[in-house]
Amino acid sequence: MKLVRGILFLALALITFIPAGSWAADDKKIVIGVTPFPHAEIVKIAAPLLEKEGYTVEIKEFNDYVTPNIALNDGSLTANFFQHVPYLDDQVKNQKYDIAWIAKVHIEPLGIYSKKVKSIGEIPSGANIAVPNDPTNNARALRVLEKAGLIKVKAGELVTARDITDNPKNIKIVELEAAQLPRTLDDTTASVINTNFAVEAGLIPAKDAIAIEDKDSPYANVLVVRKADLEKPAIKALAKALNSPEVKKFIDTELTPKGIVPAF
């Protein structure tokens, strides 16, 4: 009896200590974390292609840029799809995540929006301009403001407001969580907003932005997985589906008019 109890205890212990990130190579269930727009819509186009191959797809939506990488790294997700490459690189470096991108899908140009002015030239001296507060999008927003001729910034990747070298209009930079930026438009002169959050707020980047990032932006949004899973069949199938002709057609016809372009 003691021997039986000992074997049961050992079996339970082995089950308990299976790493959260372990994911069977023949697992037919794909759990993908996304932010709502346009990532969820894109995955919904890819899902039927995966279902034809015998996979089931569960989409989990997040409203921030932090939790999806935590959930992927700890094994709660099979993959995530919400971030661009520089943001991923920064997260891997600083949080020591064991994750990597496997496919580029689309580009969401960053735009400058305003309810107070209709053009960059109308932005007054002393204007308050809100930007994302995460390091990569913060630097990206400053480059958009520089491209618009409002400021000049030092060379480098992760620049901050402290790196502004010329600010002729004495613009005040306000740093906020990216998801909050559309709600700041009533209180700021302008805000630099990620396309996904702009569209969720009812804005149309191609029409409503008073300045927008170039379409050759290096900030492609990517499919991200744990490094240990890169060669697994389900991951390769997911990457193939997100780079399929069906997804490209959807982006070209439904999303490009809103400012989103394919990256494959």
How would you describe each model-predicted region?
Residues 73-83, 127, 150, 169-172, ...:
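Alpha-to-beta junction loops
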Residues 137-146, 242-262:
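Periplasmic-binding protein-like
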Residues 102-151, 248:
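A conserved helix-loop-strand patch within extracytoplasmic ligand-binding domains
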Residues 109-120, 220-232:
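A bilobed periplasmic-binding-protein/Venus flytrap-type ligand-binding module shared by bacterial periplasmic
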Residues 90-102, 117, 187, 192, ...:
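Ligand-binding "clamshell"
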Residues 29-46, 63-67, 84:
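Extracytoplasmic "Venus flytrap"
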Residues 26-37, 55-61, 128-129:
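Short, well-ordered beta-strand elements
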Residues 59-70, 157-183:
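Short helix-initiation/N-cap motifs at beta->coil->alpha
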